[in-house]
Swiss-Prot record:
One of its GO terms (molecular function) is protein demethylase activity. This is Ribosomal oxygenase 1. Fe cation binds at residues 340, 342, 405. One of its GO terms (cellular component) is nucleus. SUPFAM superfamilies: Clavaminate synthase-like (SSF51197). Interacts with SP7/OSX; the interaction is direct. Interacts with MYC. Interacts with PHF19; leading to its recruitment to H3K36me3 sites. Widely expressed. Overexpressed in lung carcinomas. Residues 294-439 form the JmjC domain. It comes from Homo sapiens (Human). Gene3D superfamilies: 3.90.930.40, Cupin, JmjC domain-containing ribosomal oxygenase (ROX), dimer domain. Binds 1 Fe(2+) ion per subunit.
Length: 641
């Protein structure tokens, strides 16, 4: 409590002559008054420029250059690709995605490919079965290949991961060259490289992930509610994300350890067995276990695979929560894991082969949106599945926390899929769990009613043995508790706890992926090097005329702690979860308003000379510190002295 309360101190910034009356129990920077005249002028300027920016034809999630053509809520309009309305059943026109029943399915029919894909079988639960709605996929649009977020070396299906497990910090691959293949993934990654805003890149990649379903429909009606199947009939959709060749290369070239990075498991006769030998997972051991019928689960593939890391690093900004992943390789005619439910929102991306999935609704209300993962269930514990389907490469399956699931390979075909996970312990309850103890402590310090003693005889009428008592003293006691609990909201340090959770998210996050533009205009692109016995191209400096903005939108958070202001950031994070300690910079009180302006104005540029500081020295000191740490980019490349 002391730490969070103390966090409010430095946020009431300014030198002693400008000290304001304390604002108890708020740790939020944004909740505090700014220097009104100067900061408001800057924000008005920023707002007007951002409005002008929206009218330009830059790629965005709503522009022709970057959006996915997807079905509108009203299927009475023309469908993407010129499909006639008559191709959709009347019922589907009334309810574009079918009845919101046990599961939701979407089938995309590519313009140039027709693959035989097993239909999903829906088993009625407590609600009517969902209808399969056929939605033509958007026509393929050719994207220029001169600027790739992930270039050929990182995206080729047969290429090694190439990144050590301890790699940290933002990275860009500039090896150049043309991939030997093309895929929807490659095209969307090339498109992301052309979008200037990291938030718009995250929205665009999520739109691609669940296409052709509109994201607003997904979040409004399905997120945390229903299982969703997207049937694409395009085996190349995820090509280049991860492959069995990538896994084999990792086993040969990386320090993959059993238990830490790789699990070998099988599910036989209703029992799961984990068969992890000690030590490194060399190819001989791993593939022998696979041949013996074990599924191989690669934990945290983003630590080894550049492409998976880039994929997750972009999406984590969409969720506002850590995005993780596992990769599962299952041999033919086998099942690796027992039925269970997880404590994460799961997106299953089928990469290779086929796999039969069965998904079940939570059995009881306490399992809905589960806070912890379940133990293994037996088949006798399960009812009828709400969704039973065979996933083909390119298909997507989503199910919320608490949905029981199991999967097996059949018909002599192996399966490789990646599960993208997010929203672990990111609930209202977790937020309140952090707030309430602090609110009680603050209330006891500031309100005498919380310090008054309990009735001397309260044990005579309170407790389980008196729960059926009609004693009026019991009624009065319960009413007093309700009144005090209602008052706690006035003392809840909501902003301070929000800042602490944001700080935790910064520490959980993967390091950012840089576009070509971000690299060229930041410290990562400076041409400083060692040549002929000395460093050359040294001396780039910011001036008051330099225009800057944050490198990306979600890479930093300003938090007050222990009477000081700290800017926590992600650019030095590791791809291995919490391998590095949290990284931060101290921000001086006279620079706090300027720091807030930079955080709030992204992606608009701000002149260094317009930063609301007391002196030019403070302006240049803040901007230079942020630039040198890789947190700022400039509108134009810096001139070298």
């Amino acid at each position: 409590m002391d730490g969070l309360q103390a966090s409010a101190g430095p946020l009431r910034r300014g030198r002693p002559k400008r000290r304001r009356k304390p604002q108890p129990h708020s740790g939020s920077v944004l909740a505090l008054p700014l220097r009104s005249r100067k900061i408001r002028k800057q924000l008005r300027s920023v707002v007007s420029r951002m409005a002008a920016l929206r009218t330009q034809t830059l790629p965005s999630e709503n522009s022709e250059e970057s959006r996915v053509e997807s079905t509108a809520d009203d299927l009475g309009d023309a469908l993407p690709g010129g499909a006639a309305v008559a191709a959709v059943p009347d019922a589907a026109r009334r309810e574009p995605y079918g009845h919101l029943g046990p599961a939701e399915l979407l089938e995309a029919s590519p313009a140039a490919r027709s693959l035989q894909t097993p239909s999903a079988r829906l088993v009625p639960a407590s609600a009517p079965p969902a209808r399969l709605v056929e939605v033509p996929a958007a026509p393929v649009r050719v994207v220029e290949t001169s600027a790739l977020l992930c270039t050929a070396q990182h995206l080729a299906a047969v290429q090694s991961s190439g990144a050590p497990a301890t790699a940290s910090g933002p990275q860009v691959d500039n090896t150049g060259g043309e991939p030997a293949w093309d895929s929807p993934l490659r095209r969307v990654l090339a498109e992301l490289n052309r979008i200037p805003s990291s938030r718009r890149r995250a929205a665009r990649l999520f739109e691609w992930l669940i296409a052709p379903m509109p994201p607003d429909h997904f979040y409004r009606r399905l997120w945390e509610r229903e299982a969703v199947l997207v049937r694409r009939q395009d085996h190349t959709y995820y090509q280049g994300l991860f492959s069995t060749a990538d896994l084999d290369s990792m086993l040969r070239n990386e320090e993959v350890q059993f238990g830490q990075h790789l699990d070998a498991a099988r599910y036989i006769n209703g029992r799961r067995e984990t068969l992890n030998p000690p030590g490194r997972a060399l190819p001989a051991a791993a593939w022998s276990l696979y041949q013996a019928g074990c599924s191989l689960r690669l934990l945290c593939p983003q630590a080894f695979s550049t492409t998976v890391w880039q994929f997750l690093a972009v999406l984590q900004e969409q969720f506002g929560s850590m995005a993780g992943s596992n990769v599962y390789l299952t041999p033919p005619n086998s099942q690796g894991f027992a039925p269970h439910y997880d404590d994460i929102e799961a997106f299953v991306l089928q990469l290779e082969g086929r796999k039969l999935w069965r998904v079940y609704r939570p059995r009881v209300p306490t399992e809905e949106l589960a806070l912890t993962s379940s133990p293994n269930f037996s088949q006798d514990d399960l009812g009828e599945p709400v969704l039973q389907t065979v996933l083909e490469p390119g298909d997507l399956l989503y199910f919320p926390r608490g949905f029981i699931h199991q999967a097996e390979c059949q018909d002599g075909v192996h399966s490789l899929h990646l599960t993208l996970s997010t929203y672990q312990r990111n609930t209202w309850g977790d937020f309140l769990e952090a707030i309430l103890p602090l609110a009680v402590q603050a209330a006891m310090e500031e309100n005498v009613e919380f310090r008054r003693g309990l009735p001397r005889d309260f044990m005579d009428y309170m407790g389980a043995q008196h729960s059926d008592s009609k004693d009026p003293r019991r009624t009065a006691f319960m009413e007093k508790v309700r009144v005090l609990v209602a008052r706690l909201g006035h003392f809840a340090p909501v902003d301070a706890v929000a800042d602490q959770r944001a700080k935790d998210f910064i520490h959980d996050s993967l390091p950012p992926v840089l576009t070509d533009r971000e690299r060229a205009l930041s410290v990562y692109g400076l041409p400083i090097r060692w040549e002929a016995g000395e460093p050359v191209n040294v001396g780039a400096q910011l001036t008051t005329e330099t225009e800057v903005h944050m490198l990306q939108d979600g890479i930093a958070r300003l938090v007050g702690e222990g009477g000081h202001l700290f800017l926590y950031y992600t650019v030095e994070n590791s791809r291995v979860y919490h391998l590095e300690e949290p990284k931060c910079l101290e921000i001086y009180p006279q620079q706090a308003d300027a720091m807030e302006l930079l955080l709030g104005s992204y992606p608009e540029f701000v002149r260094v000379g317009d930063l609301p500081c007391d002196s030019v020295e403070d302006q240049l000191s803040l901007a230079t510190t942020l630039y040198d740490k890789g947190l700022l980019l400039t509108k134009m490349p810096l001139a070298l002295n």
